[in-house]
Amino acid sequence: MNTALEARNELRRLQAERLDAVEAGLGENALYMTDLDNDIEANRAIYVGLAVTEIATLRAQLGGPQLG
């Protein structure tokens, strides 16, 4: 993933997959659900990191670097 938008879309896809899995009766499959939850948490961290970086980059472009 290169952008926060891509990471957000992947996070939404994983969250939808989790809902679909529960509706399909896979909620009791601990191994699958743990793996999916781990993927969601990892992707959430990637999304936040990319979003913060993009915001900081835009802020620097608009107002110059922060000093002090």
Predicted regions and their residues:
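Extended, charge-rich alpha-helical interface modules
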Residues: 1-68
